[in-house]
Amino acid sequence: MSPAITEKKRYTYEDYLKTPDDKRHELIDGELLMTPSPVPGHQRISGKLEFKLREFITKNKIGEVFDAPCDVYLDNENVVQPDILFISKDRLDIIGEKNIQGVPNLVIEIISENSVYRDMVQKKRLYARFNVKEYWIVIPEEEEIEVYILEDNTYQLYCAYKKVEELVSPSLKGLKIELKEIF
């Protein structure tokens, strides 16, 4: 007699909405995942990076910047809370009353001890599948930001910027961030 194979429950947006408010959750390919609260170092980097991005976006009047926790509804089985995201002016209609209902132009995830696989593999695949044009992965321990651009439905590394370098965005023309001001 062979053991019974049990299928994993697939969660939906409706299930996601029933999760407790006191925890941060994400829904990736129908799997409900809890995300621990970020540590102070993570928040420090996030705040500085968001400030620089928001300053550029506001000055140039090209869209809006949001930070976590902010739900990004991609479909009924995929709801994420990127650390930072940018939506261009021509796509502001995806900003709903309760969440972002569509694909941001740029997503930034900051790696933490518990999120390496999720951010570098699961979310990278997910964002590519949903056509997020630019994806940054911030690696605090390395004091590095990897910038990826979407080409043929796959992310290609545009550049891995170190702390001593100036980050240049391929899609946000004119954006330059001195990484020594972030790390």
Residue positions per predicted region:
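Gly/Pro/Ser/Thr-rich low-complexity, intrinsically disordered segments predominantly at protein N-termini
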Residues: 1-183
